[in-house]
Every structure is written in C-alpha cells, then in structure tokens.
Amino acid sequence: RIHYHRLIQERIRQLAPFLSLDSDPYIAVSDGRLQWIIDAYTLSNRYPYSEPLWRSEGIQDVLQGRAMQDIVRGGTNYIRNPVKAVVDAYDGTLKLYVVDTSDPVLASFRQSFPTLFTNLDNAPPQLQAHFRYPQMLFKIQSQIYRAYHMDQPDVFYNQEDLWDFPTQITREENPEILEPYYVIMKLPDAEAEEFMLIVPFTPVGKNNMVAWMTALCDGDNYGELLVYEFSRQALLYGPRQIDSRIDQDTEISQQLTLWNQEGSEVFRGDLLVIPIEESLLYVAP
C-alpha cells in the first residue's frame, strides 16, 4: 500500500484547506491504535469591534513559530478551535471531530461539506479523554487578556494596570518568556484534581505575581477559562524573583558552579508555578 500526503498537516490541508492548523500535533493511544491529534482553527479578520492580534503589544515575542506568525500577519481578530483532527498513524484514516458546534464560521463550512465533519459523540470515549486545550489558542487569549482584564474605562484608556508574562533564566543568563504549561492540580473549592493549562501574570515592568489564568481540559469543564487574582496588599514572588533566590542560596550556587566546570553546562528547565490551596509551589528542574 502506498500513502500519498503522509505528513499530518499536509494530509489535513488536502481535505480542509480552509482550516488553520496548530503547530504542535500530539500522539495518543485509543483502542490499541496510535492516533495523531492536531487542533484546527477557524479564523477571520472581519469580526466587528475586535482588535487585530498584530496590534497587541509584544505579540511578536509571545507568539512564535510559523503557524503563529501566519495568524498574526493575516490581521486575524477572530479565532476559534471548533475541530480536533485525528489521523491514524498506521493507515492514515482522517477524522475531523467537531468539538464546538456554536462556531458560525465552521457552520458555514459544514453546510458546504456536510460529510466531511464528524460529531463529537461519534468519537470513542478513550480518544476524547486525550483531547486537550491547545497551547496556541491559550497563548493568544492570555496575551489579549493582559490588557482587557481592565474593565474601568479610565484605567483601560491610560493602561494603568497592564499585565505581562513573567520571564525566567534558562541558559546563559538570557531571560525567556515563561510558556503556558499543563499540570494536574486541584482548583480552589474543587472536589478533585483536573488536567489544565496555566500561565502566571506579573505587572508590566515588575517581577511580582498578580494573577494566574487557567484553561480546563477535562470532561464537561473543557474550555472553561478562569482567572485568579492575588491581593494587591501582599507582594508574591514571581518567577524571576524565585530564580534570584535560588542563585543566592549558598549550597545551590556552589553546586551549580561545580557542575558548570570542565566542559559541562547546566541547563535550567522551565520554572513551574503550581498553586496549592492558599500558597504557591515553585518547581525548578
């Protein structure tokens, strides 16, 4: 058997060129078969009273990669993730599962191609359990929310409470923006742990933490966005401040210096900020 268009993105574009694809496909096991899962988006640059992404301050630093830049350059001011594309890793069978039936853009495509898409109810439960909220969409939403969390007109006009993404030191003392990351944790007042995507915020020009945002990935809560703000009366350490405290610890500093000798180099992993009850746990691999 010969397979044409074996690359995942290429295979999907042959059938649905009107969908924009995520740059991060991931593989899962469902019913004993390997399945590639990739998020598909509908875009528009004509949504009324909506700001184009390219106008958001610092967008080029946050949204990197070809797929991200294509969205920004296209003047996009509307994006939804209504489809999960699933490709069988062995025989190439492709399914486009609709996870958001309220998207009007996808609704028009479904009218034109009624047999191309499959309802989510027809997806095996084992496969549905692997669907996760996409990092790319979450980056865009959290980037926009940095400014649009301000709901007072005068505060928004003067940009008095603009947030930013924290930075971290990973290699050669160069600061890098902290990327959103997946964790399994229990939210305040929740009954059980959930799989979710989170990112912290700091005030612009400062290093203390002011809030964190999460996108839920499990079951009926899938796609729900929550923001937890900290009291302005108490300053909480942000990732850069935690990096500094780690470097100032005598025992840790001596060990890092030792490891960095004789041609060896220490690479710092992404710093994780994990909310636990009424406190924060920092994990620095």
Each model region followed by its residue ranges:
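Soluble extracytoplasmic regions of secretory-pathway and membrane proteins
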Residues: R1-P285
